[in-house]
């Protein structure tokens, strides 16, 4: 189930509308009654899509969540597969943004009380272009913090790079913002696009994670097993 759609009863959504205009389902909408009805359908598990915090055009700076440039967010709500913080949950889904993790824990608890198991998307292939964790545990290094972007591939990097090339996507890089999105050097796009010019049909809102596989030289694996 697409979590942000379940429970959103707005019948007057507008094209390209924001969360104020179009609304958003919440984790709290999965009440014990709702989950019980899902259980009656014969379900044994419920797959909550879009739980992990992902890129969005909703402004949460008042909660110390860094904003995302609109040019690299698909739609206002963003793609649930453009993960922005592996250690946090999507604030759009919470009634109380500062308490969003507790709301998620309560959702898991209600689901289990209803006799259902929980599945959520992990999305290990790629992350949002502006990935930044404000919830990572102490002692954890930010993705890409120790990368050497002078190498298109290094087994010690978290990302793949297009050295000495600025990202020049084949679409509007401002999308209404005061300044265009800037990325230098450009990083490889999530759908294995190893150049600096992704187009609108690519997963342009994401950057590919490097697990030690050198895609540019025959797919040589530098770790065994591959992480």
Name each region found by the language model.
Residues 1-117, 125-127, 131-136, 140-150, ...:
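N-terminal structural segment of carbohydrate-active enzymes
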Residues 150-152, 160:
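Active-site or metal-binding loop neighborhoods of secreted/extracellular toxin and effector enzymes
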